[in-house]
Each structure stands twice: as structure tokens, then as C-alpha cells.
Amino acid sequence: MHPNLVSWLGTLGFLLWALLCLGALTEGYPVKPENPGEDAPAEELAKYYSALRHYINLITRQRYGKRSSPEILDTLVSELLLKESTDQLPQSRYDPSLW
């Protein structure tokens, strides 16, 4: 085989692989509900608006990483805000002898 043909086949294979990976990623994304139309019955419109609200909640939800786990937040709050010892708190600059 010619080196040029092997290069083209490798490039084509990589592009096909990349398209397959992108296709797999898009399957996990929720599908927007279809609008039933203006003259649809009230029940269908209610179902549509419920599905639309669910869709919007899915695509706009906050995604938290490992740093935002509740255990770490509880630890930070207890360490930073709820300390009982005062030796690490900043001292006041108030000096009664100046007054």
C-alpha cells in the first residue's frame, strides 16, 4: 500500500470514530418535547408544559463536583465558622490607654 493511502485511511478511521463518540454523547442529552400546537386540547397542553418544565430543569440544573459534597461543606462550616477557641481569632486594635 502507498503511504499516502494509509494516511488517508487512518484519517478517515479517526473521523468516523470521532463521529461515533459524539453520537454517543448526544444520546445522553434530553430531547426537547414537541409543541402540540395552538389548537391542542387543554390536557395535551398541560402535559406539554409539564414536560417542558422538566426538560428545562434537566438542562439548567447545577452540577456539583467533588469539592461541593455535603461532608466537605459541613467540615468547612464547622472549622471556619463554629470554632470555640478564640486564640486564632484576630485581636482588636482597641487600646483603652489612648482614650
Swiss-Prot record:
Main location: secreted
Keywords: Amidation, Cleavage on pair of basic residues, Neuropeptide, Secreted, Signal
Gene3D superfamilies on file: 6.10.250.900
Molecular-function GO term, any one: neuropeptide hormone activity
PROSITE patterns the record matches: PANCREATIC_HORMONE_1, PANCREATIC_HORMONE_2
Residues modified to Tyrosine amide: 64
Pfam family, one: Hormone_3
Signal peptide feature range: 1-28
GO CC, one annotated term: extracellular space
Record's subcellular location: Secreted
InterPro entries: Pancreatic_hormone-like (IPR001955), Pancreatic_hormone-like_CS (IPR020392)
GO annotation terms (biological process): feeding behavior; negative regulation of adenylate cyclase-activating adrenergic receptor signaling pathway; neuropeptide signaling pathway; positive regulation of circadian sleep/wake cycle, sleep; positive regulation of feeding behavior
Biological function: NPY is implicated in the control of feeding and in secretion of gonadotrophin-release hormone.
Record family assignment: Belongs to the NPY family.
UniProt protein name: Pro-neuropeptide Y
